[in-house]
Amino acid sequence: MEVVKHEEGFEKLETNPNINRKVIHLKDLMFTVIEFSNGPMEMPDPPHNHPHEQISYVAAGKLKLFVEDREYLLNEGDVFKVESNLNHSIQTLTEFVKLIDGFSPIREDFLKRSH
């Protein structure tokens, strides 16, 4: 067991100046904190998919979630689930959005971007 206080054990990922992503993981479970400070977005991010299951908690802000051909309006405190291989994307609707994401299995592609 390990206790992480104030995100000291998180790895920071290189993204861009307007997106801050931190990650911590076990063998089969990954937890990320992602902060968008470039909103509101004019257009949604390009759709993407991955073999990982994802559950995300909207910790701050407001966004639109697009999953396949469906659109959802999400506010602080809402949660969304994305099954494996479904096309999905988001569009931030406020200046700042913070998401807490869980992935299983872990996103090896994220670890390759950490420093």
For the regions a language model picked out, list residue spans one by one.
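A short glycine-rich, His/Asp/Glu-containing loop-to-beta-strand
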Residues: E11-D45
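Short, conserved beta-strand element in jelly-roll/cupin
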Residues: F36-S37, N49-L65
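Short beta-strand His + acidic residue motifs that chelate non-heme Fe in jelly-roll/DSBH
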Residues: L65-F66, V82, H88-L93
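Double-stranded beta-helix
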Residues: M30, E95-H115
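A generic "binding-loop/recognition-motif" signal
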Residues: P51, R70, L86-N87, E95-F96, ...
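Catalytic-core "active-site belt" of small-molecule-metabolizing enzymes
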Residues: E2-E8, T15
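Short acidic-glycine-tyrosine-enriched beta hairpin
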Residues: D69-S84
